[in-house]
A protein has these predicted regions:
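Conserved helicase ATPase core of P-loop NTP-dependent helicases/translocases
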Residues: 107-156
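A short beta-strand element within the Helicase C-terminal
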Residues: 164-175, 200-203
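Conserved helicase motor "Helicase C" RecA-like lobe of SF1/SF2 P-loop NTPases
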Residues: 82-105
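Short, small-residue-biased leader/transition segments that mark boundaries at the very start
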Residues: 1-6
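SF2 helicase motor core recognition
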Residues: 143, 154-168, 188-193
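Conserved interdomain hinge at the start of the Helicase C-terminal
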Residues: 47-75, 79-80, 87
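C-terminal accessory region of SF2 helicases/translocases
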Residues: 197-286
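Conserved SF2 helicase motif VI
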Residues: 179-197, 201
Length: 286
């Protein structure tokens, strides 16, 4: 096999390199290579991703509740990358949602999206619904397909800008952004004029990562993004100069803090700074 040939070549090159090395260094390199190969095999053995399986559980529970309330069986899932989007589409289609998933991104140029667009053009041929602008019409075709045929839309940030999905009352942040303004914009895709049900927001947070938990705590408790009335966070979000600045501060914590104590101290400092800024801005606007 090609992999066996590659392995033999690698071993031969390694032997040539090791000839001029101190035996202790050579042994250390061999140990590191063995460790890397072990990680490689472990990665290959991963078949079912825990996070994706938990998504199935969340969808099942929330769809069941929506059915009781009379809400549509619709879910908008946000991811940070096209790669994750493609993976989730395949995973969901292989686990009970075949033909019920539509992707929405910056290009909408995959085969399924093209097929949906062609059917949409045929359906509305000669009507004013077709604007003649391909990008806009293709987006509208996917939104219409989500409304009438699909149950799940997997969207990236750039793709979902400006679309109205008030017929969907379940939003899943599969990948959580650090920018609080981006989170509110996501929720705003569903929570807008014409929405007849409370919008349920499901957030995926790695509970084993202390920094991730503190980020969620800030977003939830200081920015009021996930509880209470939509729009109640406007005053708080308005106190920020830029959500990007907030992201930069979080990124600095992730890059520089290693221990839980360091993370705790850094987040306490950031929280204190935010409280001062928020209170001052609210005071200035009164």
């Amino acid at each position: 096999a090609a992999s066996d040939v590659y392995k033999r070549q690698l071993d031969e090159e390694k032997d040539e390199i090791n000839e001029g090395l101190n035996p202790a260094i050579s042994d250390a390199i061999d140990l590191e290579i063995a460790e890397l190969r072990m990680y490689q095999e472990q990665a290959k053995s991963i078949v079912n991703e825990t996070k994706a399986k938990q998504l199935l559980v969340a969808l099942e529970k929330t769809f069941h509740k929506n059915e009781i309330l009379g809400a549509p069986k619709k879910a908008l899932i946000f991811t940070e990358s096209r790669k994750t989007q493609e993976y989730l589409k395949s995973f969901l289609q292989n686990n009970g949602y075949q033909g019920k998933v539509v992707c929405f991104n910056g290009s909408n140029n995959d085969d399924d999206s093209k097929s949906i667009y062609r059917k949409w053009l045929s359906l509305y041929a000669g009507s004013k619904r077709i604007s003649g602008r391909t990008i806009i019409d293709r987006k509208q075709a996917l939104v219409d397909h989500f409304r009438t045929d699909a149950e799940i839309m997997i969207a990236t940030e750039s793709g979902a800008e400006g679309i109205n999905l008030q017929f969907c009352s379940l939003l899943v942040n599969y990948d959580m952004p650090w920018n609080p303004q981006r989170i509110e914009q996501r929720i705003g895709r569903c929570h807008r004029y014409g929405q007849k049900f409370d919008v349920v927001v499901v957030n995926f947070v790695n509970q084993l990562n202390y920094a991730d938990c503190r980020v969620y705590e800030l977003l939830n408790e200081k920015f009021n993004l996930f509880e209470g009335v939509f729009g109640s966070s406007d005053e708080v979000l308005g106190s920020l100069e830029s959500g990007v600045d907030f992201e930069k501060k979080l990124n600095h914590i992730y890059q520089t803090c290693r221990t839980e104590r360091e993370i705790e101290a850094a987040f306490n400092q950031l929280q204190s700074e935010l409280e001062e800024i928020i209170q001052q801005r609210i005071k200035d606007t009164k």
